[in-house]
A protein has these predicted regions:
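Active-site/binding-pocket entry motifs
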Residues: 110, 184, 206, 256, ...
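Terminal targeting/pro-maturation regions of precursor/exported proteins
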Residues: 2-78, 111, 398-402, 406, ...
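Surface-exposed, non-catalytic interaction/assembly patches
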Residues: 322-338
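Cleft-lining beta-strand/loop regions that shape enzyme active-site pockets
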Residues: 25-37, 46-53, 57-58, 112-115, ...
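Glycine-biased strand-turn-strand hairpin within the trypsin-fold
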Residues: 29-51, 72-110, 362-386
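Conserved functional hotspot residues or short segments at active or partner-binding sites
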Residues: 331, 338-416
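Extended, small/polar residue-biased N-terminal targeting/export presequences
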Residues: 52-114, 158-162, 166-177, 183-190, ...
């Protein structure tokens, strides 16, 4: 047996290990079924080695198989070769690593942009939610996982990375260069829709955000404000712990979320009455750019009937991943648990369905109409600083207008 063949055999063993370990995630209920599939894999590997038209590069063949194996599970699971993992680890351990400000997934086989942080390198380069990346740094995204894509987009601050962007109405991808930067924590934009409605615009749920929201709510009560809007559009970052802590500011009883996985102990996150700060009316704004921790918050509010969730269905990306290193120096990013709403439905892929569905309209499109003749436009309360995030809400923002309408509607009288 030559060196290449021996390497292929070892690689096949790695695949067997991975397959056996995650077989249940794929829905296989017995080891026999898993190993039958492995037998087929071994036969295919042998035929490639012996019968392929040219002498195959078995490292490439096996790496491709492993990438495909992980990607077949879900959009967030990834496989890193030893070289890829070494690069990933260096960037992960470097606090000065530059980023682009994107939250990514995969759709239609390509990498797709879920959300873009305001004033981030990606936003400055003209990248928008919904953009499809055909390529990143010259590599086709149909052949890469979300983990690989994210790793390619990170690097030394001040350096650029080119992406090929597929956009509606254009036959060829646009070549766009994004210059990486060290990102600063996103600030919460505080606005007033009118004297009685506070608007908190969240573009991330960074550590400490729930405490910041608590302080704003307490301040609002002292000012005689009785209604709140939480804008979760473009909110795709932050730990779920912040979503749970935020939900507890509004929900006095019941379940907020449940975390379940094959090897993860079930965790039930419950409301805590002593943590409630706001008992008045509240509405949340969501759309397809709402993902991750923000979805856990939105689902808790919907399921506990704590207020209206207005807008569009969220993306569906609430899960937990684990980094697993392998003996050959490669690594897996494996989804090990999903978050479920209080009704027991998985948020992953399904997303959160709003209580009031309103089609999202891009603010730029609305502003281009030049209309400003109705509805109370929020008055910005914080200094006009680009680092604070997005611009003040437009009165032509249909999702915002509907939420304001619901909050200001007179209470429905109960039948006698």
């Amino acid at each position: 047996m030559n060196r290449t063949a021996r390497w292929a055999l070892v690689s096949a063993s790695v695949v067997i290990f991975c397959y056996a370990g995650i077989g249940h995630v794929l829905g296989r209920t017995t080891d026999d079924q898993a190993y039958k599939s492995l037998t087929v894999y071994g036969e295919v590997l042998q035929k490639i080695q012996s019968d392929y038209v040219d002498d195959p590069n078995m490292k490439v063949v096996t790496a491709g198989a492993l990438h495909g194996l992980l990607e077949s599970l879900d959009t967030q699971s990834s496989y890193f070769t030893p070289h890829e993992y070494e690069d990933y680890k260096k960037k992960l351990q470097n606090p000065g690593t530059g980023e682009t400000g994107l939250t990514l997934s995969k759709r239609f086989g390509y990498v797709i942009v879920i959300s873009v942080l305001p004033d981030s390198p990606a936003a400055k380069a003209g990248i928008h939610s919904g953009d499809i990346f055909e390529s990143i740094a010259g590599f086709a995204t149909r052949e890469m996982s979300v983990g690989q894509a994210t790793n390619l987009l990170t690097g030394t601050p001040g350096t650029g990375v080119k992406v090929g962007v597929i956009r509606r109405g254009k036959p060829d991808p646009d070549d766009v260069e994004i210059v990486r930067e060290k990102l600063s924590p996103q600030k919460m934009l505080v606005q007033k829709a009118d004297p009685d409605v506070l608007v908190l615009r969240l573009r991330s749920l960074d550590p400490g955000r729930a405490d910041e929201i608590r302080n704003r709510l307490t301040e609002a009560q002292s000012q005689g404000i009785h209604k709140v809007i939480l804008d979760l559009r473009e909110c795709g970052r932050g730990p779920v712990s912040e979503a749970v802590a935020t939900a507890r500011l509004f929900i006095s009883s019941g379940t907020i979320a449940t975390l379940r996985g094959q090897t993860v102990s079930n965790q039930v996150f419950s409301a805590e009455p002593n943590r409630v700060v706001w008992r008045g009316p509240v509405s949340l704004l969501t759309d397809a750019t709402t993902s991750g921790a923000a979805e856990v918050l939105a689902s808790a509010m919907v399921s506990n009937h704590r207020g209206d969730v207005v807008g569009e269905r969220t993306f569906g990306l609430a899960s937990e991943q684990k980094l697993i290193t392998l003996d050959d120096g490669s690594a897996l990013i494996l989804t090990v648990a999903n978050y479920y709403n209080p009704d027991g439905k998985s948020i992953l892929e399904e997303g959160v369905v709003p209580t009031e569905t309103v089609r999202a309209v891009a603010q730029d499109d609305a502003e281009s109409d030049g209309a400003n003749d109705g509805g109370a436009a929020p008055q910005q309360q914080s200094p006009s600083d680009p680092s604070l995030g997005p611009r003040p809400l437009s009165p032509e923002d249909q999702i915002y207008r509907k939420a304001l309408e619901l909050l200001n509607a007179p209470p429905v009288k109960k039948a006698a």
